[in-house]
Amino acid sequence: GIPCGESCVFIPCITSVAGCSCKSKVCYRN
């Protein structure tokens, strides 16, 4: 539930390596 400061509209979350995932076009972690 914490925004990672990255959007995932056009590309996947680069921050996924830090545990972030795409939700509603924004990368979140927990």
Swiss-Prot record:
Keyword Lipid biosynthesis in the entry? The reply is no
Q: Does the keyword Glycoprotein apply?
A: no
Q: Which UniProt keywords apply?
A: Antiviral protein, Disulfide bond, Knottin, Plant defense
Q: According to the UniProt record, which cysteines are disulfide-bonded? A: 4-20, 8-22, 13-27
Cross-linked sites for Cyclopeptide (Gly-Asn): 1-30
What is known about its processing and modification? This is a cyclic peptide.
The Gene Ontology biological process annotation of the record reads:
defense response; regulation of defense response to virus
Read off the domain note. Answer: The presence of a 'disulfide through disulfide knot' structurally defines this protein as a knottin.
Instruction: Provide the function of this protein.
Output: Probably participates in a plant defense mechanism. Inhibits the cytopathic effects of the human immunodeficiency virus.
Q: Name the protein family.
A: Belongs to the cyclotide family. Bracelet subfamily.
Protein name, as recorded: Circulin-C
Organism of this sequence: Chassalia parviflora
